Amino acid sequence: MNQADNSTVIIDTGCANLSSVRYAFERICSDVIVSDNHDLIKAATRVVLPGVGTAGAAMASLKDKSLVGLIQGLTQPVLGVCLGMQMMTQVSKEHGGRDIDCECLGLIPTDVEELNSQGQPLPHMGWNQISPSMHPLFAGIPAGSYLYFVHSYRVPLSDYTIASCEYGETFSAAIAKDNFMGVQFHPEKSAAIGSKILSNFLALDKASLDAALQEPKS
């Protein structure tokens, strides 16, 4: 199979939301591949890391497919979705029935802990508003936009937060470092705003992302 010049590869992690993520991208562009093939992933213009379930099970799947080191070495734009974002951190406190923390990909220096919902129901499920930054992933996304969330664990606010949300506490709705970006919400379930965020990601390649990140912020 020949690799196209402008391709998006969704990593086949075996998770349940692969189809919905793929369909969301296919509504915007045709060149979307779901694969765990190392050569295809490395050659892609951009890569998506989806995930649902527990961090431990998801990381075990990546290890079984020998994908951990490959993902850590990617230089093109990479988008983690929901659990995919959480796997980009250093450590997750979501034990998934184990007694130890889950070591993650270590791409963004922050951790995952249980969401302090201040007595509100968990998981945090449904539509909620975000406060986005000037990061190119959120180009044209107004403050207060609603996106769809389903999660019980969260990444705290830090220098790597590029969008925030509040549910009991304020947490990172999206994080980024260099070419790695992650969103806690489900853009594939978030109607027009979610599609716009995916379109923003599809507009990125290594050169354009590097240029955007080097622009001075007003």
Swiss-Prot record:
Pathway: Amino-acid biosynthesis; L-histidine biosynthesis; L-histidine from 5-phospho-alpha-D-ribose 1-diphosphate: step 5/9
Residues annotated as catalytic: 82, 186, 188
Gene Ontology CC annotations of this record: cytoplasm
Domain of life: Bacteria
Keyword Zinc: no
Subcellular location: Cytoplasm
A single MF term (Gene Ontology): lyase activity
The Glutamine amidotransferase type-1 domain, residue ranges: 7-211
UniProt catalytic activity: 5-[(5-phospho-1-deoxy-D-ribulos-1-ylimino)methylamino]-1-(5-phospho-beta-D-ribosyl)imidazole-4-carboxamide + L-glutamine = D-erythro-1-(imidazol-4-yl)glycerol 3-phosphate + 5-amino-1-(5-phospho-beta-D-ribosyl)imidazole-4-carboxamide + L-glutamate + H(+); L-glutamine + H2O = L-glutamate + NH4(+)
InterPro entries the record matches: Class_I_gatase-like (IPR029062), GATASE (IPR017926), Imidazole-glycPsynth_HisH (IPR010139)
NCBIfam families: IMP_synth_hisH
Function: IGPS catalyzes the conversion of PRFAR and glutamine to IGP, AICAR and glutamate. The HisH subunit catalyzes the hydrolysis of glutamine to glutamate and ammonia as part of the synthesis of IGP and AICAR. The resulting ammonia molecule is channeled to the active site of HisF.
Subunit structure: Heterodimer of HisH and HisF.
Protein name, as recorded: Imidazole glycerol phosphate synthase subunit HisH
Species annotation: Shewanella sediminis (strain HAW-EB3)
